[in-house]
From Swiss-Prot:
PANTHER family in the record: UPF0114 PROTEIN YQHA
Transmembrane parts of this sequence: 15-35, 53-73, 136-156
InterPro entries documented for this protein: UPF0114, UPF0114_bac
Main location: membrane
Superkingdom of the source species: Bacteria
Coiled coil: none
Any single Gene Ontology cellular-component annotation: plasma membrane
Pfam families: UPF0114
Subcellular location: Cell membrane
Keywords: Cell membrane, Membrane, Transmembrane, Transmembrane helix
Family, as annotated: Belongs to the UPF0114 family.
Protein name per UniProt: UPF0114 protein YqhA
Bilayer topology annotation: Multi-pass membrane protein
Length: 164
């Protein structure tokens, strides 16, 4: 009975495979939205105010960071929790594949969230005259919470690695 339960639990990790594949579909949706924004801005580029262009560019950078986060979670999560990626030797392989454990993935995700939050906060500050003060305050508090969380996770990771 114990062996059956252990084998069933171990095999259940494959339930995550379609979830990681779903992230690739989310990446396609993000790419479509990215290019939709490019197509939308190009005809208007000469009539746009500089600040409006910067806001669009920050949105594109934001989407790019989210896309990188999706790729990182998709591949690292699959390799850490489901199975190793079997990529042939003659194909280009990302140098971090197979080297990122769950803890380093968590730290990279936290750093990415801080970067994404920073871009979002910058976009909000560029339009600060149209944002109520209490809402600005909450944006800053939420961003600082992300920063503090990422710092604490990195610090705790360093402590546990140092003690082992």
């Amino acid at each position: 009975m114990e062996r059956f339960l252990e084998n069933a639990m171990y095999a259940s990790r494959w339930l995550l495979a379609p979830v990681y594949f779903g992230l690739s579909l989310a990446l396609i949706a993000l790419a479509l939205k990215f290019f939709q924004e490019i197509i939308h801005v190009l005809p208007n580029i000469f009539s746009m105010a500089e600040s409006d262009l910067i806001l669009v560019l920050l949105s594109l950078v934001d989407m790019t960071l989210v896309g990188g986060l999706l790729v990182m979670v998709m591949f690292s999560g699959y390799e850490n929790f489901v199975s190793q990626l079997d990529i042939s030797e003659n194909k280009e392989k990302l140098n971090w594949l197979g080297k990122m454990d769950a803890t380093s993935l968590k730290n990279k995700v936290a750093a990415s969230i801080v970067a994404i939050s920073s871009i979002h906060l910058l976009r909000v500050f560029m339009d600060a005259k149209n944002v109520p003060d209490n809402k600005l305050m909450w944006y800053v508090i939420i961003h600082l919470t992300f920063v503090l969380s990422a710092f604490v996770m990195g610090y705790l990771d360093r402590l546990t690695r140092h003690n082992h």
